[in-house]
Amino acid sequence: MTTPLDAFGPGVIIVTRTDIANSTPVNIGYAQEFSPEFSGNIKELFGQNQFPIDAARGTVKVTGKIKAAVLSGLAWNTAFFGSSFVTGGIKWNPLEAASVPAVSTYTVTVINAATFDADLGVVYALTNLPFVKVASAPAAGQYSVSGVGVYTFAAADASAAVLINYTSTVTTGQTLTIANSLLGSSPSFQLDYYTSRSNKAFVARYYQCQSAKISFAAKLEDFIMPEFEVHMFANSAGNLGKLYFPEVS
C-alpha cells in the first residue's frame, strides 16, 4: 500500500545570510520545531443583510517559530545578531578552594591569575556565607582583589578556608560581540527546510527572512532550547519562496 505524503518530526533547517557575499550555510542544530504561519487580513463587504456579499484578502504576514537544541553562535549570528566573532573567550572558575595564610600578608593568588579577568565573589567554605568586597584594608569577613588575581583578606580571617569565584580568559572558542547598532540594522537570510518520510521529501525555501526575537530559557531538569521568531518577506524578484511536494496529491 502506498502511503500519502506525510511528515514526522521537526526536519532540518539551514540558514544562509543574503545581505553579505559568500555566506556560509549554517544548520541551526538539532531542530526541535519549525512552525511557519501565513496570516492574511480579510476585508468583508456588507450590505443591509447579516452576511457579507464579498471579501478580499489584503496584506499577508508570514512568520515562523524555530526551536533548536544546540547553542550555535554561528546560527545565532546568522539569524539575529549579524555581528562578528573574535577568537577566545571567558572561562568560569567556580568555587576554587583556597586557604587564607596563617600569617601576613593574608593574600591568595588564584590558579589562573596570569589570565585573570573578573572577580565573581568569595564565600567561606564551611558556612557558604559570602565575604564583602572592599577597595582596600579589609576587616573580618571582607576581601579586596587586584587586577591580577591576588585576593587580600583580614588578619581576623587567617587560616580560613575560602571558595573563590572568578573568570579568566582563554584562547579557545569564539566570542560574539553584540554592538549597539543603528536602527534598521539586522541580518537577512534564506531559510531552507527539509523533511522526509517513506522516501518522500517535503522541501521549503524562504528567500528573505529576518528574526524579530531570539530567546533561550534555562530551566531546572530541562535542556536549553533556543527559539527564533522569524519573519519572511519577498525578495527583489517579488517572490517569497517555494514549497516542493514530491507527488501530485
Which residues does each PLM region occupy?
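Secondary-structure transition/turn motif
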Residues: 69-70, 111-114, 127, 152-159
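Extended beta-strand solenoid/passenger and fiber regions
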Residues: 73-142, 167-189, 193-202
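Protruding loop/beta-arch "assembly-hinge" segments enriched in small, turn-prone residues
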Residues: 221-249
